[in-house]
């Protein structure tokens, strides 16, 4: 995709985010009042403008920041684990924050100082991620994934036990309220507390956009391309965990933003993480702002929790993803309709090469799918034209998937040799 088009997409999403922020600060019990926002910004010390400055503006800024952080973290997790169902809390970040938050709420420590709850939740999230990295960091991405799932289950049991045995019913209710995720009561102090880790974590992920493009193809291909796979994976996971921990610390657990938004971006604009990550940040902020806006106005005068709205929207989307994946697996010969690469790939129609959704970003690929036969371990190429090498390299494992796709478009064919075919 041309850089000019990248810029147009990001500018459009930025405009949408600004409009959503204006709507978030302008809509209230008295309807849409954009003039009130301008008045409040021009005279912030006026007591008449306290509602906008102290309540609506912090809530809007928190929604934009947390939505962006969750979406970027989700996109990074899906790339590292090569799993479309990966989300920011998969490494135990959310559960670690939740355990500490619930303990502080039930014990009464959270009531002593408003800042103790987000600080404690942030520390708990980082401790959980550290455990996952220490236990599973030396293994593959699948090992980290399994350790994260086990830790989530263990911490979830602790949370359930603490809430079930809470002496004060009101404390138990407050803990459940926090677990569902909400933006009510957020202040400028909360923003100042988490702004730095959120921004640092997001930048840390975006710096590795090119490496994520290669990790999506496979760790073997990334390694042959000169990427230090283990180091890159650990840095990206820590950066994603950092920005997630900061967001969860002040809002509670808001589900599905980190799962849904990256998928929407990939479906619409492709899988190049140089675009996916910033676009996910902008669309994630916009999406959470709209979800919070819906939570405030759908059931007036009662306000729903923001996490409830995101779950109501995200759960059906997850079902659509599952149905679509099952349909693709059941398609004849694994052939992907509409995939231009598969149509030019001689292996696909002949031997039924499986077509996967883990698309590799490439300027000439218009579909959302790709043939994975060139990147499966053990498959060897006959064609030196595909590898762009001399005859001496025929029969060596495929590497450099971008060069391979270029050759596919130039030659119109590609032949593979595999012992099982």
Model regions: which residues?
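Alpha-helical transmembrane segments in inner-membrane proteins
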Residues: 1-335, 363, 370, 419
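Short, low-complexity, intrinsically disordered N-terminal modules
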Residues: 338-339, 389, 412
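Conserved acid/base catalytic micro-environments in cytosolic active-site loops
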Residues: 340-341, 402
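Short, surface-exposed "cap/lid" segments of acyl-processing enzymes
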Residues: 342, 352, 360-387
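Active-site catalytic motif of lipid deacylating hydrolases and related acyltransferases
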Residues: 374-408
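Intrinsic-disorder-associated, low-complexity terminal segments enriched in Asp/Asn/His/Tyr and depleted
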Residues: 345, 356-357, 362, 369, ...
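Cysteine-centered motifs
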Residues: 336-339, 347, 373, 381, ...
């Amino acid at each position: 995709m041309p850089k000019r088009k990248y810029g147009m997409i990001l500018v459009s999403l930025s405009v949408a985010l600004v409009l959503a922020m204006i709507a978030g600060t302008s809509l209230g019990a008295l309807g849409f009042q954009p003039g009130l926002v301008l008045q409040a910004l021009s005279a912030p010390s006026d007591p008449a403008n306290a509602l906008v400055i102290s309540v609506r503006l912090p809530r809007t800024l928190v929604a934009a920041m947390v939505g962006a952080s969750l979406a970027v973290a989700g996109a990074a997790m899906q790339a590292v684990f090569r799993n479309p169902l990966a989300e920011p809390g998969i490494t135990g970040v959310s559960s670690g924050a939740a355990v500490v938050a619930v303990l502080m709420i039930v014990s009464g420590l959270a009531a002593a100082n408003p800042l103790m709850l987000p600080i404690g939740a942030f520390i708990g999230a980082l401790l959980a991620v550290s455990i996952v990295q220490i236990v599973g960091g030396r293994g593959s991405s699948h090992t980290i994934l399994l350790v994260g799932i086990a830790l989530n289950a263990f911490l979830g049991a602790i949370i359930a036990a603490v809430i079930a045995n809470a002496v004060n019913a009101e404390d138990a209710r407050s803990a459940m309220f926090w677990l569902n995720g909400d933006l009510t009561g957020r202040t400028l102090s909360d923003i100042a507390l988490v702004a730095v880790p959120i921004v640092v974590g997001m930048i840390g992920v975006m710096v590795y956009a090119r490496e994520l493009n290669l990790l999506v193809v496979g760790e073997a291909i990334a390694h042959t391309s000169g990427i230090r796979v283990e180091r890159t994976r650990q840095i990206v996971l820590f950066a994603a965990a950092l920005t997630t921990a900061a967001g969860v610390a002040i809002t509670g657990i808001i589900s599905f933003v980190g799962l849904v938004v990256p998928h929407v971006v990939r479906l619409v604009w492709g899988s190049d993480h140089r675009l996916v990550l910033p676009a996910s940040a902008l669309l994630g902020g916009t999406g959470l702002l709209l979800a919070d806006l819906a939570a405030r106005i759908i059931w007036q005068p009662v306000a729903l929790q923001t996490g409830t709205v995101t779950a109501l929207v995200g759960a059906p989307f997850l079902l659509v993803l599952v149905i679509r994946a099952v349909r693709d697996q059941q398609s004849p010969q694994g052939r992907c309709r509409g995939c231009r690469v598969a149509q030019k790939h001689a292996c696909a129609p002949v031997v039924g090469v499986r077509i996967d959704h883990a698309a590799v970003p490439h300027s000439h690929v218009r579909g959302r799918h790709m043939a994975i036969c060139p990147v499966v371990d053990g498959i060897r190429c006959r064609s030196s034209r595909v590898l762009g090498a001399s005859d001496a390299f025929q029969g060596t494992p495929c590497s450099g998937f971008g060069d391979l796709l270029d050759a596919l478009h130039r030659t119109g064919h590609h032949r593979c040799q595999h012992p099982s075919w």
